[in-house]
């Protein structure tokens, strides 16, 4: 009893053979004593019920309480009635289970979560079905041939040409238009790639720079060096002198040497008329070693030797003409 009065301060109507009745502001034993051996239905018991719930200042409230008091209404139940043969804790647990069931039960009229998910899936399916699907068209060889013929004539056919082509190829005008768009993109890509390759080939042909030097120049360089060492002993080429380094930077600047040799040759034609050709070649090599660049390439040497031979023949003819005139 003490446990119930302290922990569970509940209200219940006074009923016969009821062991549990608790009111506000009083202990359970006091309430039970005031309700013993009394009939709980009538005006006489109204005062005791009011005393259990609290005193009222005026008498007319007793009449009103007689009509609306929970003591007179047996249908209202604010507490837990003990059933014979069952302990109290089972009743309390049952009441708590009922409250939990009421809280967890869904509200009527509201769709459940599974139904909402189904509605969402249906909406997604409707949206996806409303989207335009893309289908890949497989063209036959005859269709491609007809399309390529028109593409060779014009890259941008008008609507009339596309409709006529669609009738011949048994395609729709939209398919023909899409094919021409893709074909133009492919053609532009090929043209761009061809221009890049052409530019690369032109650059390679214009600026063809070989990394390794030519091998045919090595024997001529060695021969010129040996000839210079054998003739003078202390002859130093112009490339080794610091004051004449400009001649090393221009390997083909032989104009002063050639002009002086040609001038000396024309002035002294009679003097060189009896000199053998081999001695003249040796002198020209020595002159080139002292005045200009000693490293001669093979084509330059051949050109000079042929021009010297022609001048030698002209000198002989001139000498013969002079002697014949005398």
From Swiss-Prot:
Residue numbers carrying Phosphoserine: 12, 69, 306
Residue spans crossing the bilayer: none
GO biological process, one term: embryonic skeletal system morphogenesis
Keyword Acetylation: yes
SMART domains recorded: HOX
PTM annotation: Acetylated at Lys-131 by EP300; increases interaction with EP300 and stimulates ALX1 transcriptional activity.
Major localisation: nucleus
Keyword Ligase included in the entry's annotation: no
Motif (OAR): 306-319
Modified residues (N6-acetyllysine): 131
Subcellular location: Nucleus
Gene Ontology terms, MF aspect: DNA-binding transcription activator activity, RNA polymerase II-specific; DNA-binding transcription factor activity; RNA polymerase II transcription regulatory region sequence-specific DNA binding; sequence-specific DNA binding
Record-level GO cellular component terms: Golgi apparatus; nuclear body; nucleus; transcription regulator complex
DNA-binding region extent: 132-191
Domain notes for this protein: The OAR motif may negatively regulate DNA-binding and therefore transcriptional activity. It is found in the C-terminal transactivation domain that stimulates transcription.
Job of this protein: Sequence-specific DNA-binding transcription factor that binds palindromic sequences within promoters and may activate or repress the transcription of a subset of genes. Most probably regulates the expression of genes involved in the development of mesenchyme-derived craniofacial structures. Early on in development, it plays a role in forebrain mesenchyme survival. May also induce epithelial to mesenchymal transition (EMT) through the expression of SNAI1.
Quaternary structure, from the entry: Binds DNA as a homodimer; required for transcriptional activation. Interacts (via homeobox domain) with EP300; acetylates ALX1 and stimulates its transcriptional activity.
Protein name as annotated: ALX homeobox protein 1
Gene it is expressed from: Alx1
């Amino acid at each position: 009893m003490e446990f119930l009065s302290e922990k569970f301060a509940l209200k219940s109507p006074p009923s016969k053979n009821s062991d549990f009745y608790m009111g506000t502001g009083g202990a359970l034993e006091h309430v039970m004593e005031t309700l013993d051996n009394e009939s709980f239905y009538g005006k006489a018991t109204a005062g005791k019920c009011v005393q259990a719930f609290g005193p009222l200042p005026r008498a007319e409230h007793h009449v009103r309480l007689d009509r609306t008091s929970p003591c007179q209404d047996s249908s209202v139940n604010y507490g837990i009635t003990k059933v014979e043969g069952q302990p109290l804790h089972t009743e309390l647990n049952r009441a708590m289970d009922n409250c939990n069931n009421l809280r967890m039960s869904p509200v009527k009229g509201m769709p459940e979560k599974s139904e909402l998910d189904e509605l969402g899936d249906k909406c997604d399916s409707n949206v996806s079905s409303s989207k335009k699907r893309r289908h890949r068209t497989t063209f036959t060889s005859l269709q491609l041939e007809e399309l390529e013929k028109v593409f060779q004539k014009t890259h941008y056919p008008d609507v009339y040409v596309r409709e006529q082509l669609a009738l011949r190829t048994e395609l729709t005008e939209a398919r023909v238009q899409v094919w021409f768009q893709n074909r133009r993109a492919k053609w532009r890509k090929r043209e761009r790639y061809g221009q890049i390759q052409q530019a690369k080939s032109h650059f390679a042909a214009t600026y063809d720079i070989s990394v390794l030097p030519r091998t045919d120049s090595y024997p001529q360089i060695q021969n010129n060096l040996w000839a210079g060492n054998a003739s003078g002993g202390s002859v130093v080429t112009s490339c080794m002198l610091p004051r004449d380094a400009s001649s090393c930077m221009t390997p083909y600047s032989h104009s002063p040497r050639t002009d002086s040799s040609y001038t000396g040759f024309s002035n002294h034609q009679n003097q060189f008329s009896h000199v053998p050709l081999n001695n003249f070649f040796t002198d020209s090599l020595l002159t080139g070693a002292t005045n200009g660049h000693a490293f001669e390439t093979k084509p330059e040497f051949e050109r000079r030797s042929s021009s010297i031979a022609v001048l030698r023949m002209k000198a002989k003819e001139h000498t013969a003409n002079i002697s014949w005139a005398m």
